[in-house]
Every structure is written in C-alpha cells, then in structure tokens.
C-alpha cells in the first residue's frame, strides 16, 4: 500500500507493508508546501495543491503515480468580490472531491470560502455562485476565518448513491448541504455549539474541522468540531455530541 503525505517541504510517498518499516519511495515538489492531496478512486489520478512562496497556489496532477506531473488551470475569482467590496482572490487550495457517478465532475474547496466545480475532469473550474452568494455569507461575522484570514472549505462529501447530493464543511461557517448538485444550499448546524461566540447556538458561524460521511449510510455523518466531536443520523438535520468517559471526545 502506498501512502501520500503532504508536508511543508514536499509530497512524500511511502510504501506500507505489514510488520515492516515504512519505505520512502519518492519526494515530489521538494521544498514546496503541499496543502492538499486527493486520489480520485475512479481514475487513480493523483491531485495536489501546492503553495509557492513566489508563484502562489498551484494545482498539479499525475496519472502515473508521480513519474510525470502536469499543471492544471487554476480556479479564478476574477469578477467576484468579498462582502466588503474588495476583489476576491484565491488564497489557498484546501480540498478536492470527485463527483461520484458523474465521471467528469470534480469539486474544489478553497480559501476565501469559494467552492469550485469542473465538468471536464479538471480542465477548467467555475465558482459555485449559489454558495458564494448565500445569504448567510453577506452578513459580516457569519462566515469568518479560523486560524486564517478568511473562511475556507476543507471537507467535501458526496453521497455515493446520488451524486447530486453533497455536503461541504466551512471553517468558520459550518456544514452546508445541497440536494441539487450545488444549485441551492441549506445550513445543517442544529445541535452544534460554538462556545467562542456570544450565541453558541448560531445557525451559521460554527467551526467544523473535518467532515466524514458513512458511504453505506449517507445520512450518517461525523465531524470533528472546534467544540467537540458530533454525529448525525438524519443528514445533518440534528447533530449530537459524542461524550466519552475515556479517550477522545
């Protein structure tokens, strides 16, 4: 089994075998920070998001496990603005996900909170305007950065039984669900607590750190949150905190 590890000094590839010390196979993009790694299980293509200090953000992919890398066209915020009227600019690539049964669909999560999609296998990406223009975003303070200047989309989960159904996790804003391939979005944060805010029960302003879906039961999701670990059995309509007497909780 191969394991890909993104670090501030490059992409590390290791071979993991039972009862053996992991073996380093390769280092790619030596000296550059690799912020995002995604392996498309459908095509086995590797994708990476790279932060160059001089050239900024870059997206690269390989179809032969790193023998040959190609640079993809970056998603663009050209023509879009932040809520304060300033021009929106790509700051960081955070996450990627495939489109399930839609073989050419890819989703890309970024900072400052834009979700991009591709319908041609990553040749081009377009900003998902319904989420970018979501009413909850237009009120300053509802979407904000956590450990960063701006909100960012770090998790994207696709229903394997219905590729039009997806969730994104935004820090800070919360979990949002779309049932129509991104044409509309609903916040799904009931039951979460944002103890760092004056009103901890806010619908938008939550800080999920990671979101995972059970592929066999897509209504079951888990999230590691700034304020605890939560799960839902009804697709995010209500979240329940996990309480453990011992261990992580």
Region spans (language model):
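Extracellular glycan-interacting surfaces
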Residues: 1-249
